[in-house]
Amino acid sequence: MQKLPAGRKRSYLMYTLTGLKLKNPTILAAGVLGTTGASLCRVAREGGAGAVVTKSIGPAPKTGHPNPSMIELDCGFLNAMGLPNPSYPGFLQELEFAKENSDAPVIASIFGGTPSEFAEVAEGLLPAKPDAFELNVSCPHAEGYGAAIGSNPCLVEAVTAAVKDVVNVPVWVKLTPNVADITCIGNAAESGGADAVVAINTVKGMAIDIESGYPVLGNRSGGLSGKAVKPVAVKCVYDLFTALEIPVIGVGGVSSWEDAVEMIMAGAAAVQVGSAVYDRVGIFSEIGKGIEAFLKRKGYSDIKKITGLAHEMV
């Protein structure tokens, strides 16, 4: 291991992802504490996240689905929020606040119904100078948006290319697991010019009240997140790491440093945390410290030494 100058502390976790400097490989996932600039800054400063992603913002104000829109299960959460948002003009001030006050990169999550709508939203948020954009082509419970686009490789490529044409910052594409072959969608994003893919969004799910017979969610069905989806996410990351040349950011069921290391060994360049933030905002620092201790104990000089390690175990 290379020796450092006296007084300088080795950083096991700091690295660059799609040109963005992260203090650690943990990122706040879209949709959790990303509604205001203040909450994004809190996650970055108090929580210790390496980067933060906003809630998904669209071309027009949207109220979302009726309540109940989120329920807790034994194995995670089931939600059908329906992409509620104030529109990009209504969110611009919050994004500007986050950019001015966050000590970590701020990524704007956006959605639309067509490639031109995605481009419109991206252009509309550019004055706030987000560090990157994350394209939500994977929400499973918003008709005409999200997975309705993300299950079509041609549309994914077109949406990605449309946004790349109007921005000069990295573009990440968040993928849905609710397809026959996620690598096909990942390849489409890469062909469109994506700088990274994010895998995965929630898995289609449903819960029914057996006393009444009614579906529990106001939208009847929704998306499952939390611990139950981690094996699905790990497999998707593993497959995408093999199929793509661009980085894969893992998300789905990460609630400990062990989960994060597993995702990284599958091929994730970084991990996003969503559902687990409801338990404690400081989980990002906890995961970062746990990964660093693991790297030291195992004798790895930095996190890149374990990225995709599972692929070498043949």
From Swiss-Prot:
Alphabetic keyword roster: Cytoplasm, Flavoprotein, FMN, NAD, Oxidoreductase, Pyrimidine biosynthesis
Gene3D superfamilies: Aldolase class I
Cofactor(s) it depends on: FMN
Cofactor stoichiometry and binding remark: Binds 1 FMN per subunit.
Ranges that cross the membrane: none
Main location, first listed in the record: cytoplasm
Any one GO BP annotation for this protein: 'de novo' pyrimidine nucleobase biosynthetic process
Pathway where it operates: Pyrimidine metabolism; UMP biosynthesis via de novo pathway; orotate from (S)-dihydroorotate (NAD(+) route): step 1/1
Annotated residues for binding of substrate: 55, 79-83, 136, 201-202
Compartment(s): Cytoplasm
Keyword field contains Cell inner membrane: no
EC class of the enzyme, as a word: oxidoreductase
Top-level taxon in the UniProt lineage: Archaea
EC identifiers of the protein: 1.3.1.14
Active-site residues, Swiss-Prot/TrEMBL: 139
Coiled coil: none
Residues that bind FMN: 55-56, 136, 174, 200, 226, 252-253, 274-275
UniProt family annotation: Belongs to the dihydroorotate dehydrogenase family. Type 1 subfamily.
The protein's role, per its UniProt record: Catalyzes the conversion of dihydroorotate to orotate with NAD(+) as electron acceptor.
Quaternary state and interactors: Heterotetramer of 2 PyrK and 2 PyrD type B subunits.
Protein name: Dihydroorotate dehydrogenase B (NAD(+)), catalytic subunit
Taxonomic path: Archaea, Methanobacteriati, Methanobacteriota, Stenosarchaea group, Methanomicrobia
Gene: pyrD
